[in-house]
Amino acid sequence: MRLIFVLLATFVNAAFSYKILVFSPATSKSHLISNGRLADELARAGHDVTVLELDFLGISQTTNSVKVAKKRIIDGFQESTNFKNVLHGFSETVMEEPSFTDEIKGWWAYQNVYNDLCAEFLKMDDIFNELKNAKFDGFFAEQINLCGFGYAHALEIPRHFLISSCPFAAPVYDFTGLPMPTSTVAFAADLSISPTYTERARNLFVAVLTKLEFTLLNNRLQAHFQHKFGEHFPSLYSVTSDVDVIFVATDEIIDISTTTLQNIVHVGGLGVDDDVAEMDNVFASEMSKGKEGVIYFSLGTIANTTKIDSKVMRTVLDIVKKFPDYHFVIRADKYDLSTREYAKSVSNAFVSDWLPQPAILHHPRLKLFITHSGYNSIVEAARAGVPLINIPFMFDQNLNSRAVEKKGWGIRRHKKQLLTEPEEIEKAISEIIHNKKYSLKAQRIRDLIKSKPLSSSQLLIKTTEWAIKNHGLDEIKFESRGQTTWTYYNLDVIIPVFWLSISLVIPTIFGWYKFSCFGHVEEKKGKSKRD
């Protein structure tokens, strides 16, 4: 009887499970972990999930990105060295204030190498045939590059889901058909709490140019797909804009509120609480130190402490000395010997190249997290109810820091202040540890997230199953997806009408002036002067 029950349960589970492919290029450890968490949630729900990790950086083997889903690693990319060099370039210049042209060049270099890596992947026919024969029902990929969606179309996977790994960047608005909120959301350039005219103008200008750059880069990627699959291969933009659901790996409680759509679903925080494990004795001992508690400091992986100005970490440790009642747990790169050496003279500092971040953030003695504002760190802190000092460096980090600042559970500081105004960092630390409003607001953010009617996991699983079961969700896709900004805002109507109006109004005014009494007076004055 028990055997029959087990067989019946297995049959029922198989009948209602779907085969899902998660496309997860190794662009950073945080992206691998984020995609792995999403895959694991679907796998725990009984679906047959495969995570395809294209190991661009040689980090997949050592990154514990997947716990339940299947993991398939593809390595041996010739362009990996060039990709690493681009990322190292970001680390080396991370403390500089890049000009607009520097940002354009950096993004161009990044996407160009990404496109070349995609072209390499397209040549792996054995992998392609294996995946095509697997007959997947659904496909997930991030927004960073459109390689995955072109590949999914070639594999003939019927249902596509876009993962926005961070708050929307300018090109994503094209996929959705949403108007870009350039006056309120700092997704292209910085906007203060009350944006000035100059800030709004720069945000709009950078957003438009970023979209243009992405289009040009996408055309090059399109050429790779047409070379492989024929000249009639559809536009990658049209393939991507036709996704059934956009899963945003952020939480609407944290983000700056803006316009949304029926097929945009926020799933920030997937698997975060699952990673909260017990600390080993070493870290548990460190968390017990400090008369008033513990402060955690981490700049993430892009701001590599070995490559940035050594004065940065020395400044941080000098700040630590001024708060003797608090113990500081600090992350530094494993090759950063100078920081470790200097830290020996700081009695209330512990430095390590790896720290159990989720466990640290949930520890009751933690009072503050000083972070680079990467979204994984933001959402982990939010779910733990920990106030933040945000020091953004690049990418979406500036937008994330502004969102925290606007919601009132953290303070933003400029990265240059680590070198030029360390007293401003000190003031921020003092403000948060002495003013309870930040911790109270952080706890409210935590409570709002955890008491939502549906969890991120439930939304992900139920929405995915709903879309696949019903063969798509065309009925809720935004009508303007794929429309250009030109037609969405009726600029093709407004501008011609404007110029036509000008062409009629100016001659009319000129004619009225010439034949009016004013015109006659001017004409008489002219004659008098000639006489």
Swiss-Prot record:
Location in the cell reads:
Membrane
Membrane-traversing stretches: 493-513
What topology does the record note for this protein and the membrane? Single-pass membrane protein
Reaction catalyzed: glucuronate acceptor + UDP-alpha-D-glucuronate = acceptor beta-D-glucuronoside + UDP + H(+)
Which GO terms label this protein's molecular function in UniProt? glucuronosyltransferase activity; UDP-glycosyltransferase activity
Q: Which UniProt keywords apply?
A: Glycoprotein, Glycosyltransferase, Membrane, Signal, Transferase, Transmembrane, Transmembrane helix
Where do glycans attach? Answer: N304
Q: Which residues, if any, are the signal sequence?
A: 1-17
Which Gene Ontology terms of cellular component type are present?
membrane
Q: Which family does it belong to?
A: Belongs to the UDP-glycosyltransferase family.
Q: What is the name listed in the Swiss-Prot or TrEMBL entry for this protein?
A: Putative UDP-glucuronosyltransferase ugt-46
In its UniProt entry, the species of origin is given as Caenorhabditis elegans
Q: What lineage does UniProt assign to this protein's organism?
A: Eukaryota, Metazoa, Ecdysozoa, Nematoda, Chromadorea
